Amino acid sequence: MKERDSRNQIGDLPFRVKEGFSVYEFIEQLYEANVVERINRFLVKVTFNGKEFLAHLHDPGRLKDLIYPGNLVLIRETKGYKTKFSITAAYSNSRFVVLDSRLHNIIASKFLPEAYEKEIKVGNSRIDFKYDNTYLEVKGCTLVENEIAYFPDAPTERGRTHLKELRELMKKGFNAILLILVMRDDAKCFLPNEKTDPKFSIEFWNSIKEGLNVNIKTFKLVGNKIIYVRDIPLCKTNLT
Protein backbone atom coordinates (compact mmCIF):
# COMPACT_ATOMS: atom_id res chain seq x y z
CA MET A 1 0.00 0.00 0.00
CA LYS A 2 1.41 3.36 -1.03
CA GLU A 3 0.20 6.78 -0.10
CA ARG A 4 -0.32 9.49 -2.62
CA ASP A 5 2.11 12.41 -2.29
CA SER A 6 0.44 14.66 0.27
CA ARG A 7 1.47 17.73 -1.73
CA ASN A 8 -0.99 16.62 -4.41
CA GLN A 9 -3.86 16.18 -1.98
CA ILE A 10 -6.52 18.74 -2.81
CA GLY A 11 -9.51 20.13 -1.01
CA ASP A 12 -8.19 22.03 2.02
CA LEU A 13 -11.00 23.55 4.06
CA PRO A 14 -11.06 27.20 5.17
CA PHE A 15 -11.03 26.66 8.93
CA ARG A 16 -7.90 24.75 9.92
CA VAL A 17 -8.84 22.79 13.04
CA LYS A 18 -5.72 21.74 14.92
CA GLU A 19 -4.85 18.08 15.23
CA GLY A 20 -5.94 16.78 18.62
CA PHE A 21 -8.87 19.21 18.74
CA SER A 22 -12.20 17.93 20.08
CA VAL A 23 -14.95 18.27 17.46
CA TYR A 24 -17.77 16.69 19.47
CA GLU A 25 -18.48 15.76 23.08
CA PHE A 26 -21.18 13.34 24.20
CA ILE A 27 -23.13 14.68 27.16
CA GLU A 28 -24.67 11.26 27.80
CA GLN A 29 -22.73 8.55 29.60
CA LEU A 30 -21.36 5.83 27.33
CA TYR A 31 -21.87 2.23 28.45
CA GLU A 32 -20.19 -0.94 27.23
CA ALA A 33 -22.50 -3.61 25.79
CA ASN A 34 -22.20 -6.64 23.54
CA VAL A 35 -23.96 -7.34 20.27
CA VAL A 36 -26.42 -10.24 20.24
CA GLU A 37 -27.65 -9.79 16.67
CA ARG A 38 -28.47 -7.15 14.11
CA ILE A 39 -32.23 -7.21 13.60
CA ASN A 40 -32.29 -4.88 10.59
CA ARG A 41 -30.42 -1.86 9.22
CA PHE A 42 -31.32 0.34 12.17
CA LEU A 43 -31.96 -2.05 15.04
CA VAL A 44 -29.49 -4.15 17.05
CA LYS A 45 -30.10 -6.43 20.01
CA VAL A 46 -27.45 -5.98 22.71
CA THR A 47 -26.72 -7.26 26.21
CA PHE A 48 -26.07 -4.69 28.94
CA ASN A 49 -25.85 -5.38 32.68
CA GLY A 50 -27.01 -8.95 32.10
CA LYS A 51 -30.17 -7.93 30.23
CA GLU A 52 -31.07 -7.74 26.56
CA PHE A 53 -32.12 -4.43 24.99
CA LEU A 54 -32.87 -3.16 21.52
CA ALA A 55 -30.56 -0.33 20.45
CA HIS A 56 -30.99 2.09 17.57
CA LEU A 57 -28.18 2.05 14.99
CA HIS A 58 -28.01 5.26 13.00
CA ASP A 59 -25.78 3.93 10.24
CA PRO A 60 -27.21 2.12 7.18
CA GLY A 61 -23.89 0.50 6.19
CA ARG A 62 -23.30 -3.24 6.24
CA LEU A 63 -20.79 -2.89 9.11
CA LYS A 64 -19.97 -6.60 9.01
CA ASP A 65 -16.61 -5.95 10.67
CA LEU A 66 -18.23 -3.93 13.48
CA ILE A 67 -21.74 -5.19 14.24
CA TYR A 68 -21.60 -8.94 14.76
CA PRO A 69 -22.55 -11.29 17.63
CA GLY A 70 -20.31 -10.83 20.65
CA ASN A 71 -18.55 -7.66 19.56
CA LEU A 72 -18.12 -4.87 22.07
CA VAL A 73 -20.07 -1.66 21.47
CA LEU A 74 -20.69 1.60 23.28
CA ILE A 75 -24.30 2.63 23.83
CA ARG A 76 -25.94 5.73 25.26
CA GLU A 77 -29.44 6.49 26.44
CA THR A 78 -31.52 8.41 23.92
CA LYS A 79 -34.85 10.17 24.08
CA GLY A 80 -37.45 10.39 21.34
CA TYR A 81 -36.79 6.94 19.91
CA LYS A 82 -38.66 3.68 20.32
CA THR A 83 -35.51 2.15 21.78
CA LYS A 84 -33.94 3.18 25.08
CA PHE A 85 -30.38 3.15 23.73
CA SER A 86 -28.45 4.17 20.63
CA ILE A 87 -25.24 2.55 19.49
CA THR A 88 -22.44 5.10 19.57
CA ALA A 89 -19.37 3.10 18.57
CA ALA A 90 -18.12 -0.44 17.95
CA TYR A 91 -14.76 -2.02 18.77
CA SER A 92 -12.30 -2.87 16.00
CA ASN A 93 -8.51 -3.14 15.83
CA SER A 94 -7.96 -2.00 19.44
CA ARG A 95 -10.14 1.12 19.13
CA PHE A 96 -13.75 2.25 19.12
CA VAL A 97 -15.17 3.31 15.76
CA VAL A 98 -17.89 5.97 15.92
CA LEU A 99 -21.01 4.81 14.07
CA ASP A 100 -23.63 7.52 14.54
CA SER A 101 -24.06 9.24 11.16
CA ARG A 102 -26.17 12.00 12.74
CA LEU A 103 -22.88 13.49 13.92
CA HIS A 104 -21.23 13.81 10.52
CA ASN A 105 -22.55 17.22 9.55
CA ILE A 106 -22.03 18.56 13.07
CA ILE A 107 -18.38 17.53 12.87
CA ALA A 108 -17.98 18.81 9.31
CA SER A 109 -19.27 22.25 10.32
CA LYS A 110 -16.27 22.66 12.65
CA PHE A 111 -14.05 22.93 9.57
CA LEU A 112 -16.17 25.56 7.78
CA PRO A 113 -16.36 29.35 8.01
CA GLU A 114 -19.11 30.80 10.18
CA ALA A 115 -21.24 31.83 7.20
CA TYR A 116 -22.55 28.74 5.44
CA GLU A 117 -25.82 27.29 4.18
CA LYS A 118 -27.07 23.77 4.97
CA GLU A 119 -29.01 21.21 2.94
CA ILE A 120 -29.04 23.10 -0.35
CA LYS A 121 -31.39 21.67 -2.97
CA VAL A 122 -29.48 20.83 -6.14
CA GLY A 123 -31.28 18.98 -8.92
CA ASN A 124 -33.18 16.09 -7.38
CA SER A 125 -31.05 15.88 -4.24
CA ARG A 126 -29.54 18.04 -1.52
CA ILE A 127 -25.90 18.94 -0.94
CA ASP A 128 -24.83 19.24 2.69
CA PHE A 129 -23.15 22.66 2.73
CA LYS A 130 -22.45 25.76 0.66
CA TYR A 131 -20.08 28.60 1.53
CA ASP A 132 -18.78 31.33 -0.76
CA ASN A 133 -18.56 29.73 -4.21
CA THR A 134 -18.16 26.19 -2.87
CA TYR A 135 -20.52 23.25 -2.45
CA LEU A 136 -19.46 20.55 0.00
CA GLU A 137 -20.86 17.05 0.45
CA VAL A 138 -20.02 14.96 3.55
CA LYS A 139 -19.58 11.19 3.69
CA GLY A 140 -18.80 9.12 6.78
CA CYS A 141 -16.40 6.19 6.54
CA THR A 142 -15.99 3.34 9.05
CA LEU A 143 -14.36 0.56 7.00
CA VAL A 144 -10.58 0.17 7.21
CA GLU A 145 -8.62 -2.81 5.88
CA ASN A 146 -4.82 -3.02 5.85
CA GLU A 147 -4.57 0.67 6.80
CA ILE A 148 -6.74 1.73 3.84
CA ALA A 149 -10.06 3.47 4.47
CA TYR A 150 -12.84 2.50 2.07
CA PHE A 151 -16.18 4.10 1.21
CA PRO A 152 -18.85 2.92 0.78
CA ASP A 153 -19.25 -0.37 2.64
CA ALA A 154 -22.61 -0.92 0.89
CA PRO A 155 -23.78 0.15 -2.60
CA THR A 156 -24.93 3.77 -2.51
CA GLU A 157 -27.05 5.16 -5.32
CA ARG A 158 -27.42 8.34 -3.26
CA GLY A 159 -23.64 8.74 -3.11
CA ARG A 160 -23.36 8.34 -6.88
CA THR A 161 -26.09 10.94 -7.39
CA HIS A 162 -24.27 13.42 -5.16
CA LEU A 163 -21.10 13.06 -7.22
CA LYS A 164 -23.04 13.68 -10.43
CA GLU A 165 -24.66 16.77 -8.92
CA LEU A 166 -21.25 18.09 -7.82
CA ARG A 167 -19.92 17.64 -11.35
CA GLU A 168 -22.84 19.61 -12.75
CA LEU A 169 -22.14 22.39 -10.26
CA MET A 170 -18.49 22.49 -11.33
CA LYS A 171 -19.60 22.89 -14.96
CA LYS A 172 -21.50 25.99 -13.83
CA GLY A 173 -18.37 27.49 -12.31
CA PHE A 174 -18.74 26.46 -8.67
CA ASN A 175 -16.06 24.76 -6.58
CA ALA A 176 -16.94 21.34 -5.17
CA ILE A 177 -15.51 19.37 -2.26
CA LEU A 178 -16.18 15.83 -1.10
CA LEU A 179 -15.35 15.68 2.61
CA ILE A 180 -14.79 12.15 3.89
CA LEU A 181 -14.85 11.66 7.65
CA VAL A 182 -13.03 8.47 8.63
CA MET A 183 -14.39 7.77 12.11
CA ARG A 184 -11.30 5.90 13.28
CA ASP A 185 -7.56 6.63 13.26
CA ASP A 186 -5.97 3.46 11.85
CA ALA A 187 -6.08 4.45 8.17
CA LYS A 188 -3.11 5.88 6.28
CA CYS A 189 -4.88 6.60 3.00
CA PHE A 190 -8.27 6.33 1.28
CA LEU A 191 -9.78 4.60 -1.74
CA PRO A 192 -13.32 4.29 -3.07
CA ASN A 193 -14.61 0.77 -2.46
CA GLU A 194 -14.53 -0.59 -6.00
CA LYS A 195 -15.37 -4.14 -4.94
CA THR A 196 -18.52 -3.14 -3.08
CA ASP A 197 -19.75 -0.37 -5.40
CA PRO A 198 -17.87 -0.22 -8.73
CA LYS A 199 -20.27 2.40 -10.08
CA PHE A 200 -19.45 4.76 -7.21
CA SER A 201 -15.74 4.18 -7.79
CA ILE A 202 -16.09 5.14 -11.46
CA GLU A 203 -18.04 8.28 -10.54
CA PHE A 204 -15.43 9.15 -7.90
CA TRP A 205 -12.44 9.01 -10.24
CA ASN A 206 -14.31 10.74 -13.06
CA SER A 207 -15.29 13.53 -10.68
CA ILE A 208 -11.68 14.05 -9.58
CA LYS A 209 -10.60 14.25 -13.22
CA GLU A 210 -13.19 16.98 -13.72
CA GLY A 211 -11.94 19.01 -10.75
CA LEU A 212 -13.61 17.63 -7.63
CA ASN A 213 -11.61 18.36 -4.49
CA VAL A 214 -11.41 15.54 -1.96
CA ASN A 215 -10.54 16.08 1.70
CA ILE A 216 -10.18 13.08 4.03
CA LYS A 217 -10.01 13.46 7.80
CA THR A 218 -9.51 10.84 10.50
CA PHE A 219 -10.91 10.89 14.03
CA LYS A 220 -10.75 8.89 17.24
CA LEU A 221 -12.95 8.49 20.29
CA VAL A 222 -11.22 9.43 23.55
CA GLY A 223 -13.48 9.09 26.57
CA ASN A 224 -16.64 10.93 25.57
CA LYS A 225 -14.95 13.16 22.98
CA ILE A 226 -14.41 12.75 19.25
CA ILE A 227 -10.92 14.03 18.42
CA TYR A 228 -9.68 15.18 15.03
CA VAL A 229 -6.46 13.25 14.33
CA ARG A 230 -5.14 14.23 10.90
CA ASP A 231 -5.82 14.46 7.18
CA ILE A 232 -4.85 11.49 5.05
CA PRO A 233 -4.25 11.33 1.28
CA LEU A 234 -5.70 9.21 -1.46
CA CYS A 235 -3.82 5.95 -1.83
CA LYS A 236 -1.53 5.84 -4.82
CA THR A 237 -3.04 3.91 -7.72
CA ASN A 238 -2.77 4.06 -11.48
CA LEU A 239 -5.67 6.53 -11.31
CA THR A 240 -4.00 9.07 -9.00
From Swiss-Prot:
Q: Which residues form the signal peptide?
A: none
Family matches, as CDD domains: SfsA-like (cd22357)
Gene Ontology terms for molecular function: DNA binding
InterPro entries, from UniProt? Answer: SfsA, SfsA_C, SfsA_N
Q: Which family does it belong to?
A: Belongs to the SfsA family.
Q: What is this protein called?
A: Sugar fermentation stimulation protein homolog
Q: Which organism is it from?
A: Saccharolobus islandicus (strain M.14.25 / Kamchatka #1)
Native organism taxonomy: Archaea, Thermoproteota, Thermoprotei, Sulfolobales, Sulfolobaceae
Q: In the UniProt record, what gene is named as encoding this protein?
A: sfsA
